[in-house]
Amino acid sequence: MVRMEDIISLAKRKGFVFQSSEVYGGLSGVWDYGPLGIELKENIKREWWKSMVYLHENIVGLDSAIFMRSEIWKASGHIDGFSDSMVDCKDCKSRFRADFVDLSKNCPNCKVGNNFTSPRNFNLMFKTHIGVVEDSSSEIYLRPETAQGIFVNFRNVLDSSRLKIPFGIAQVGKAFRNEIVAKNFIFRTCEFEQMEMQFFVHPKQIDEWFCYWQQNRMNFFIETLKIRPDRLRLKAHNSTELAHYAKSAFDIEYEFPFGFQEIEGIHNRGNYDLTQHSKFSNNSKVFEYHDLLTKERYVPYVIETSAGLTRSVLMTLCDAYSEEELSDGDKRIVLRLHPKLAPYKIAIFPLVKKVELVEVARRIYVELCDDFHIFYDDSGTIGKRYRRQDEIGTPYCVTVDYNTIEDETVTVRERNNMTQKRIFINDLYSYIKTEILNYKEDVNK
């Protein structure tokens, strides 16, 4: 099992993730995504969007605002009920979520004793004001979830897209939670991104579609992101774990170095949200569906799939990370990412920094950069350049050498098994495209 400290070291060293405000001492629970991190994050997001919107004719996209009227959060139950229970250790002053510690045992931080304060609720929403006057009428919140932006746009999307039940609305966006304890690197943070889809169905079809989306979402991680199946599991919520809006729920969990944790939730939200907004807005018809064939009018039930994008980045790094002992006794760190997720698809090297080789390498870069994200490197030994690309997950390295000048061929080196092939420059585009399309995950990953 990979160690968390190895993932954090790689992420910071190679430019996947940086501590926010680091030059000022850092800000707990907040992270910046570097040049490689943003590429990996965008690639995961792109695959999710494709799997949701492009592969389902009855699912469309939305990008709702972060700021919304506070009445929305009153209706959804977040103002009154979106809180965690917290306790403080009286000896070391550390703060914990009450459900994360055994109050009958010693403090996990100072180990002195179980001298905890009584549990008290802590609302997780960030409150601010909009406009020039700071009073109760101008109170506004940073959204703690993206779902409510979908629900209040139910009628807008339904009418403008000419959709019929069942249909879904997908959204990727930032959410904010004032976590009592932000921990485990980018797993639990105050600012994060969600990939959510709300699927609206007839109440009598809720069980059928609930089962469908459980399987569909598990398949996404296994078949699309190529996450190892033995590190994934589907876990049902018991009645005490259900959110205030959920009738039933399942989590897809991944086995991180710190144990199995949720990466996506599939929830049967019933008609809770649409009914609440119907009541609080005094506009019931907006949240009602009229079936023109059966003449039936009803408030749809909702199945939610809610995945953490930033958690998915951490999962992908953990799942792809490997260390190998080579025959010469050296150690090789490899990120065995699927090529479609890799920040760079190709690295191009002139064997040595000679004008005639650099010119050809630059020409290849220009010819391919419109179709592939490419890293160009002409410094250091070829072996060190290979190792640098292995560490960041680049699947293919193209080397221009003196034979290239004679026969217009280059060496293509594959990341996982380090095999090399001579390929004509004119065939590079089709070769790389075919390799990515037919990529098989490494069984030794």
UniProtKB/Swiss-Prot annotation:
InterPro entries: aa-tRNA-synt_IIb, aa-tRNA-synth_II, aa-tRNA-synth_II/BPL/LPL, Anticodon-bd, Anticodon-bd_dom_sf, Gly-tRNA_synthase/POLG2, Gly_tRNA_ligase_bac, GlyRS-like_core
GO cellular component: cytoplasm
Top-level taxon of the source organism: Bacteria
Molecular-function GO term, any one: protein dimerization activity
The keyword Nucleotide-binding is assigned to this record: yes
Binding site for substrate: R97, E145, F192, E193, Q194, M195, E196, E304, T305, S306, A307, G308
Top-level class of the enzyme under EC nomenclature: ligase
Sequence positions that bind ATP: 177-179, 187-192, 262-263, 308-311
Subcellular location: Cytoplasm
Gene Ontology biological-process annotations: glycyl-tRNA aminoacylation
CDD domains: GlyRS-like_core, GlyRS_anticodon
Alphabetical list of SUPFAM superfamilies matching this protein: Class II aaRS ABD-related, Class II aaRS and biotin synthetases
Entry keyword set: Aminoacyl-tRNA synthetase, ATP-binding, Cytoplasm, Ligase, Nucleotide-binding, Protein biosynthesis
Catalysed reactions, as listed in the record: tRNA(Gly) + glycine + ATP = glycyl-tRNA(Gly) + AMP + diphosphate
Enzyme Commission identifier(s): 6.1.1.14
Subcellular location, principal: cytoplasm
Function description: Catalyzes the attachment of glycine to tRNA(Gly).
NCBIfam families named among the record's database cross-references: glyS_dimeric, PRK04173.1
Assigned protein family: Belongs to the class-II aminoacyl-tRNA synthetase family.
Name of protein: Glycine--tRNA ligase
Organism: Borreliella afzelii (strain PKo) (Borrelia afzelii)
